[in-house]
């Protein structure tokens, strides 16, 4: 059962195997389970780890969390194709043989500058892709047309909404991804691309501590590019996972995420005014202010 399924933006083109979405549940009558997380004070963010307790929750329990570890997908990752399918698999999109899709994330990410990938990441990734595939064209899908076109005015941005972005990634043979879960699902649900390049350390790309945020986002068969444009060896990625388990084993203080939330000026502004202001500023300063594309 998915709560608030009507708010799921991809419901028009994805078919999810879910129970009755019209049935109303009284939250106060349900149990609650939250995926275990910890706060990394050096990276200044929450780290979500695989939480084995999820396999032991009772019925009638609301499950909350990031839930991005592939260890939840048992017996294997292939199980997602049982529960999530395209409503129409007709490939009416670009010829993928010599095309690489760049999934550039802007929008709300610009509120959190540590999430925005530097231009050098994309330039290095395109250079790396050309080493693997000499004859290749690049196209962009993005949630922020103004931001992406400012970064790369000479690269074509594929127009459309969330469906077009998803489908172009679903059918692609080559992809360069941002640190966003949006790119994960079409890549994993579609025919596996020949090459996928993604940012090392994910949500804290190039951090000086050489830590992943979060280790749940380390996915098999992808190439992980560091801040210097180097593709990290699989053995180095595995060592990172091992080191993180050792580091986080020493964390032992539990609290709620609300404890870390701080109010800012925007919290005191009416939502309607915030949206209007954000839209205006995103047009004036596309590299610094984001407005989420609907």
Please give the residue ranges for each predicted region.
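Donor-binding and catalytic core of enzymes assembling or modifying cell-surface/extracellular glycoconjugates
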Residues: 123, 129-215
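Hydrophobic beta-strand segments of well-ordered beta-sheets in folded domains
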Residues: 1-2, 61, 98-100, 135-138, ...
């Amino acid at each position: 059962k998915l709560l608030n399924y009507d708010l799921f933006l991809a419901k028009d083109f994805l078919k999810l195997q879910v129970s009755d979405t019209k049935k109303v549940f009284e939250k106060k009558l349900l149990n609650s389970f939250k995926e275990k997380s910890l706060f990394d004070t050096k990276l200044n963010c929450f780290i979500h780890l695989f939480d084995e307790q999820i396999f032991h929750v009772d019925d009638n329990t609301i499950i909350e969390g990031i839930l991005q570890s592939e260890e939840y997908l048992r017996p294997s990752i292939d199980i997602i194709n049982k529960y999530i399918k395209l409503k129409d698999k007709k490939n009416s999109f670009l010829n993928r043989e010599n095309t690489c899709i760049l999934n550039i994330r802007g929008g709300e990410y610009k509120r959190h500058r540590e999430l925005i990938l530097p231009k050098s990441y994309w330039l290095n990734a395109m250079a790396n892709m050309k080493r693997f595939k000499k004859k290749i064209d690049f196209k962009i899908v993005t949630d922020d047309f103004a931001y992406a076109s400012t970064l790369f005015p000479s690269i074509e941005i594929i127009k459309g909404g969330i469906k077009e972005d998803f489908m172009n990634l679903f059918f692609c043979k080559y992809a360069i991804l941002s640190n966003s879960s949006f790119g994960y699902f079409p890549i994993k649900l579609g025919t596996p691309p020949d090459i996928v390049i993604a940012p090392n350390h994910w949500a804290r790309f190039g951090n000086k501590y050489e830590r992943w945020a979060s280790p749940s986002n380390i996915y098999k068969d992808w190439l992980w590019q560091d801040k210097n444009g180097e593709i990290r060896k699989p053995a180095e990625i595995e060592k990172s996972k091992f080191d993180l388990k050792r580091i986080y084993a020493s964390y032992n203080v539990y609290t709620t995420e609300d404890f870390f939330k701080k109010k800012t000026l925007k919290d005191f502004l009416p939502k309607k005014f915030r949206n209007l202001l954000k839209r205006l500023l995103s047009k004036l300063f596309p590299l610094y202010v984001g407005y989420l594309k609907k």
